[in-house]
């Protein structure tokens, strides 16, 4: 029962609108938060401390076992590659030498400036008190913005599970965020709660209350707060939205008739990259096939009630340190770095089968400087525990109607090699049960895997151009409809005869 998924009784987690909300002060752009240093009383409880310590140890062992299995699996997969000796194809647009001296840092601003852009750190507060990091892409060439097809129209982009806004800025000029900004759009990158070490109005990050959330909270609070923030900052009544995996799952849940369907009146376009609505065959494989048998009491004993397997973030930090020390031992450092980056890639990558076949090798280390981001144990239980998304196979009951008339125009971008989520069942569901959904575009790229819609070397040709083309056609059509309606209303005010054709 979803009502019993809450870790503690302070949140009902059965969202019926009766629980207390925190009201933001004055504006969504609140003062810069100060991370809480005060440890809550519960940490002074030895029983809680011991249980959490044991959970960290057990979950770390589980993670290392998964990584080892993943490395063995990948090593076997390398044998055919070595036999074929097939090199990475050269692309006419790629200037490899330009990026040789690039640093490996965890700074969105650094990667933006290296491509002729900048990024502003901004933040928003949700109604339940969480501070969210927002990144606004600044295009230094204002004339280019005016000339581009976007003409200053705002787009909000939201990341997937374990990821952050950094996923959309590490592919140089061909990053989704920078490419759209170069086309004239105002680009805002959202981040879910807990990403970039953001805090809460009342709860310390050490407190279990801080981590008592799942995707339903993201749909009720985080996404609406981000959408309203972008609308407020840009002055537009409606904005475009692009979400990858959990990012679009959050939007599908928010727009459903059980949550906040009125959010659809604020969106002019919804682009879903790897739509996470129907589960793929990978969810029936190890380790997800075992995780989905765990009930909540067992889950919290294994993984705790704070963030999910914190060792993942530690491994990311260690891999970074190996790239910044030991310069005299260059060859040893390079070998160790590759091994650690492989491990860092393998823990979420093997779990969700994020293969790197279509990526540029030089980009992989910086891609994973921003991955993984902290995720609550309760959020992972929603995805992979007992009676979870993995068990059900879909976000909602497939034979029901999910969306009301406010649902925004939708474009779907799937991957032919994506085994984590499936796009075609969603298309069939929309055609059978969703008369209120206007499906603008369905594109399933045969070679694409789960993250290739923005990380693949050819993502611009596979996906980005299609997004802009679809949005432009839809926007022009809406503008023409508004013009016709406006002319009809103006004519009817002063004439009794019909509007001439």
PLM regions and their residue ranges:
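Catalytic histidine-centered segment of alpha/beta-hydrolase-like enzymes
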Residues: 447-461
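Conserved alpha/beta-hydrolase "acid-adjacent" motif
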Residues: 419-425
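Alpha/beta-hydrolase active-site loop
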Residues: 209-232
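Conserved alpha/beta-hydrolase "nucleophile elbow" surrounding the catalytic nucleophile
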Residues: 159-160, 239-248, 415
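Alpha/beta-hydrolase-fold enzymes
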Residues: 8-88, 232-237, 246-394
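Short beta-strand/loop motif that positions the catalytic acidic residue
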Residues: 406, 411-414, 418
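An N-terminal hydrophobic leader/cap segment in hydrolases
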Residues: 71-125, 135-138
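Short, surface-exposed "cap/lid" segments of acyl-processing enzymes
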Residues: 126, 131-205
């Amino acid at each position: 029962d979803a009502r019993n998924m809450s870790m503690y009784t302070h949140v009902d987690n059965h969202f019926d609108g009766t629980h207390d909300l925190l009201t933001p002060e004055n504006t969504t752009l609140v003062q810069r938060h100060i991370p809480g240093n005060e440890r809550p009383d519960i940490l002074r409880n030895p029983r809680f401390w011991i249980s959490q310590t044991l959970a960290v140890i057990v979950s770390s062992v589980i993670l290392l076992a998964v990584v080892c299995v993943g490395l063995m699996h990948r090593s076997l997969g390398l044998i055919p590659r070595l036999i074929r000796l097939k090199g990475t194809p050269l692309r006419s647009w790629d200037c490899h030498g330009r990026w040789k001296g690039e640093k490996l840092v965890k700074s969105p601003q650094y990667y933006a400036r290296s491509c002729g852009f900048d990024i502003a750190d901004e933040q928003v507060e949700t109604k339940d008190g969480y501070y969210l990091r927002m990144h606004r892409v600044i295009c230094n060439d204002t004339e280019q913005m005016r000339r581009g097809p976007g003409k200053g129209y705002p787009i909000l982009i939201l990341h997937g599970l374990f990821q952050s806004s950094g996923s959309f800025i590490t592919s140089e000029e061909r990053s989704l965020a920078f490419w759209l900004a170069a086309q004239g759009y105002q680009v805002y990158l959202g981040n879910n709660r807990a990403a970039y070490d953001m805090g809460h109005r009342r709860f310390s990050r050490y407190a279990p209350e801080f981590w008592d959330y799942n995707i339903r909270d993201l749909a009720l609070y985080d996404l609406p707060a981000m959408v309203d923030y972008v609308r407020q900052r840009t002055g537009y009544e409606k904005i475009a939205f692009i979400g990858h995996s959990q990012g679009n799952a959050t939007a599908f849940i928010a727009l459903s008739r059980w949550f906040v369907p009125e959010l659809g009146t604020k969106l002019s376009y919804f682009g879903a990259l790897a739509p996470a609505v129907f589960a793929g065959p990978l969810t029936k494989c190890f380790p997800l096939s075992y995780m989905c048998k765990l009930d909540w009491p067992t889950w919290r004993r294994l993984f705790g009630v704070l963030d999910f397997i914190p060792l993942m973030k530690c491994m990311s930090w260690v891999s970074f340190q190996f790239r910044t020390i030991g310069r005299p031992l260059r060859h040893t450092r390079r070998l160790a770095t590759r091994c650690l980056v492989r491990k860092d890639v393998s823990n979420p990558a093997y779990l969700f089968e994020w293969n790197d076949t279509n990526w540029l090798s030089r980009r992989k280390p910086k891609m994973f400087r921003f991955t993984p981001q902290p995720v609550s144990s309760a959020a992972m239980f929603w995805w992979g525990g007992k009676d979870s998304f993995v068990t059900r196979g879909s976000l909602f009951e497939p034979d029901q109607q999910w969306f009301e008339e406010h649902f925004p125009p939708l474009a779907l971008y799937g991957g032919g090699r994506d085994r984590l989520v499936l796009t075609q069942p969603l298309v069939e569901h929309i055609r059978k049960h969703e008369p209120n959904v206007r499906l603008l575009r369905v594109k399933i790229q045969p070679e694409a895997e789960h993250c290739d819609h923005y990380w693949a070397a050819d993502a611009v040709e596979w996906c980005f151009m299609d997004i802009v083309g679809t949005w432009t056609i839809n926007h022009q059509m809406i503008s023409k409809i508004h013009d016709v309606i406006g002319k009809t209303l103006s004519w009817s005010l002063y004439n009794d005869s019909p509007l001439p054709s």
